């Protein structure tokens, strides 16, 4: 009984953190006013094998209601028609420029090197990195620049709306935001000057140019597979201000459209954690299992198999209802499928399986694959 009360108490603390995050996260939107003086912004798009996404992304970026910006796209040695598509689009859009990436040098991970090349060619006093699988509202740039300038940030990143077009995405992607918003005290991290991990997300990273180069640009994170999180840490180390916002009203993305991409994408995250501390990954999943998954099993077992006292059932039922309410709130705020809470246990089971897969690859020393490139554990440690 005491154990179940402790689990419920932990769940309520997670719920409180979730509520504080949703309450205090800033939300750029159509209602944001224009800046009196609009700084010139370079929108930088690294693209590798993005023929299915790049045209939609550029169509949304070229129609921004912001007066001063350029769009640079770097084809990172794609094996598909990404470069051909961008070349066709730029003929009618002089603000769009296509760059061709250099071969990946020794000691660099792929995306950091692509971003570094883009930044070297950027002319803006602000630099915005966006992924090629993102789509943006016409007022995106106006609204995020208003927040970034007013808040005097060194790096602004955030949580876009995640579209789900298949069952694997419905199982995992809504669960991702549930975990992030429950675990990370974003409301606190946005205001502390301590050098703690940040919730920087590589799909959208906005810098003043001088702050980007102050830390050395992407060269500071050149060995990182999940370079976004580490870039936030570097900004904090340099005394800069990091801010994470809710981007769901100005940007959406459709990540990991196949099961294979989803496994690869999550595997690189877990691989990076394992390379730093296998014990940390084990601890995270132990907590996730006990707090977010086990209550469902306990309830079924207590009702149908091992008959438990009524007060025990009430406590475990409260655990399950708390999880469901938290899931529904997150799905509502980020416009996710509201029935996805029914798939909640499958989301945790999927991530545990991928974590075990990453652990096995790390133990065997075979590295982890991402977009046709193989990375070894040395790409996670400076």
Language-model segments: what does each one mean?
Residues 24-31, 50-63:
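Short, well-formed alpha-helical segments that are part of the catalytic scaffolds
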Residues 58-105:
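Acidic donor-binding segment of Leloir-type glycosyltransferases
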Residues 148, 152-180, 210-213, 218-280, ...:
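Catalytic donor/gating beta->alpha subdomain of glycosyltransferases that bind UDP-sugars
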């Amino acid at each position: 009984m005491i154990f179940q009360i402790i689990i419920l108490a932990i769940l309520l603390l997670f719920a409180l953190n979730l509520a504080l995050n949703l309450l205090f996260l800033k939300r750029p939107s159509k209602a944001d006013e224009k800046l009196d003086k609009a700084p010139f912004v370079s929108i930088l798009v690294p693209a590798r094998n993005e023929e299915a996404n790049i045209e939609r992304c550029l169509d949304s970026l070229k129609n921004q209601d912001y007066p001063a910006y350029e769009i640079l796209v770097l084809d990172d040695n794609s094996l598909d028609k990404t470069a051909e598509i961008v070349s066709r689009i730029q003929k009618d859009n002089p603000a769009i420029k296509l760059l061709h990436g250099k071969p990946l040098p020794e000691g660099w991970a792929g995306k950091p090197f692509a971003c570094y090349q883009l930044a070297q060619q950027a002319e803006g006093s602000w630099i915005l990195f966006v992924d090629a699988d993102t789509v943006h509202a016409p007022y995106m740039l106006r609204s995020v620049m208003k927040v970034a300038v007013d808040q005097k940030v060194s790096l602004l990143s955030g949580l876009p709306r995640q579209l789900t077009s298949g069952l694997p995405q419905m199982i995992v992607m809504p669960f991702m935001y549930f975990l992030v918003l429950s675990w990370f005290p974003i409301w606190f991290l946005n205001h502390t000057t301590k050098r703690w991990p940040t919730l920087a997300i590589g799909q959208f990273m906005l810098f003043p140019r001088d702050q980007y180069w102050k830390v050395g640009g992407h060269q500071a994170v050149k060995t990182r597979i999940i370079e976004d999180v580490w870039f936030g840490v570097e900004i904090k180390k340099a005394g800069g201000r990091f801010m994470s916002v809710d981007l769901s009203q100005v940007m959406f993305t459709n990540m990991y459209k196949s099961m294979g991409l989803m496994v690869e994408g999550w595997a690189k995250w877990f691989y990076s954690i394992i390379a730093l501390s296998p014990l940390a990954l084990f601890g995270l999943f132990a907590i996730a299992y006990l707090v977010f998954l086990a209550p469902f099993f306990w309830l079924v077992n207590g009702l149908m198999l091992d008959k438990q006292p009524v007060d025990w059932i009430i406590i475990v039922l409260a655990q399950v209802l708390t999880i469901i309410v938290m899931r529904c709130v997150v799905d509502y705020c980020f416009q996710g499928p509201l029935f996805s809470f029914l798939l909640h246990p499958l989301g945790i089971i999927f991530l545990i399986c991928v974590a075990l897969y990453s652990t096995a690859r790390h133990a065997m020393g075979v590295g982890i694959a991402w977009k046709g490139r193989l990375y070894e554990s040395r790409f996670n440690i400076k």
